[in-house]
């Protein structure tokens, strides 16, 4: 059976390509999703994408993933990384292995960005590779999860 991967993007990631391009680059979320779809299709797997600026919508999507038979999640939680116990609890509750990704290196930024509520339960964390980090996370999910 083909792998089924869910790519989740949190608040403000819909602004990739225009928001602080010196930090996040010029690649748009549509570009990221298109490249991810091609990468997953080449592996004979399925990709579902979802972006929301709302914590509850992301939690609802994570909970739905369990019923859909999602095998792995790649998530860029954006600013919710540093604030959302509820997002962590949702990921823990569904017990779907996930990779946390950040376009920028959160450890080189403001002190409040250094802590992640998700990394302690993630299979892996990728940060600072720009949007290329998505491809690395998806590659890992396809091969290892």
UniProtKB/Swiss-Prot annotation:
Substrate binds at residues 76, 82, 89, 103-104, 113. The active site is at residues 24, 102. Gene3D superfamilies: Dehydroquinase, class II. Keywords: Amino-acid biosynthesis, Aromatic amino acid biosynthesis, Lyase. GO terms for molecular function: 3-dehydroquinate dehydratase activity. InterPro entries: DHquinase_II, DHquinase_II_CS, DHquinase_II_sf. It is an enzyme of class 4 (lyase). GO terms for biological process: amino acid biosynthetic process; aromatic amino acid family biosynthetic process; chorismate biosynthetic process; quinate catabolic process. The keyword Iron does not apply. Its EC number is 4.2.1.10. It catalyses: 3-dehydroquinate = 3-dehydroshikimate + H2O. The record marks 19 as: Transition state stabilizer. PROSITE patterns: DEHYDROQUINASE_II. Pathway: Metabolic intermediate biosynthesis; chorismate biosynthesis; chorismate from D-erythrose 4-phosphate and phosphoenolpyruvate: step 3/7. Pfam families: DHquinase_II. It comes from the Bacteria. NCBIfam families: aroQ, PRK05395.1-1, PRK05395.1-2, PRK05395.1-3, PRK05395.1-4. Belongs to the type-II 3-dehydroquinase family. Catalyzes a trans-dehydration via an enolate intermediate. Homododecamer. This is 3-dehydroquinate dehydratase. The gene is aroQ.
